[in-house]
Amino acid sequence: MSVKRLIITAVAAEADAVASGLDGAQPHPQGSANVRHTATADILVAGVGSAAAAAATAAALARRHYSLVICTGIAGGIGIAGIGDIVVADAVHPADLGAMSPDGFIPLEHLGIATTANAIDPPVVEELTGPLRYAGLAPVIGGILTVNTVTGTDAHADDLRRRYPGAVAEAMEGYGVAVAATRAGVRYGELRVVSNRVGRRDRRAWDIPGALRRLEHAFAALGAAWCNDGSGQAAAREIDGGCP
């Protein structure tokens, strides 16, 4: 049975950074620009947003078995997470899935409609953070929010911090990936690199190139661990060149 991981990104630049970190990315045999193969993971460009991410993840999991699904890319930092920080989710929250009221936002749980709680299994958190710590990359652990509209005002950022005091980042795909993986019975996690602080939209303060470089470094550390734990060597036989 394969032990490969499935890595989901929103855009190609994120997938390229991940593939560079893992080393040895191979072109898809059908020539798809949306898939990159490495010895230990398949990297899929799903598109922007939770719906696109859920659909792409579900389709990929229907085609083959993966041991772990990781949603990754760049993100806005909240709370203690600063620009350039690598953040790993201990929970995924759909921060705008619910209803508005005169008293503010009401999540689905409080409406009695559904549950949106998606805590990450602690062993998955450790699987992602352990190699990062070993490489000296000091990950920040906390909740990662999934939104359909990214935050662009300080007032909304303050509201998110109030509602999710343990949150460290905001992105757009994690909840969709979590739902698809959970329904397929596959473990999942989310890892991001902060490119900007959540709040008033100021592109001059963003560092997307730096965040992508840090994303590459993060997956270089993960790839080394995956190759060295034995399971990576088994997966390596599926790809010419294998693990370094």
Swiss-Prot record:
One record GO biological process: menaquinone biosynthetic process
UniProt pathway annotation: Quinol/quinone metabolism; menaquinone biosynthesis
E.C. designation(s): 3.2.2.26
Keywords: Hydrolase, Menaquinone biosynthesis
Keyword Hydrolase: yes
Catalyzed reactions: futalosine + H2O = dehypoxanthine futalosine + hypoxanthine
GO molecular function: adenosylhomocysteine nucleosidase activity; methylthioadenosine nucleosidase activity
Keyword Transcription: no
InterPro entries referenced in this protein's UniProt entry, alphabetically: FL_hydrolase_MqnB, Nucleoside_phosphorylase_d, Nucleoside_phosphorylase_sf
GO CC terms: cytosol
Gene3D superfamilies for the chain: Nucleoside phosphorylase domain
HAMAP family, per the entry: MqnB
Record family assignment: Belongs to the PNP/UDP phosphorylase family. Futalosine hydrolase subfamily.
Entry function: Catalyzes the hydrolysis of futalosine (FL) to dehypoxanthine futalosine (DHFL) and hypoxanthine, a step in the biosynthesis of menaquinone (MK, vitamin K2). Cannot directly use aminodeoxyfutalosine (AFL) as a substrate.
Name by which UniProt lists this protein: Futalosine hydrolase
Species this protein is from: Acidothermus cellulolyticus (strain ATCC 43068 / DSM 8971 / 11B)
Lineage: Bacteria, Bacillati, Actinomycetota, Actinomycetes, Acidothermales
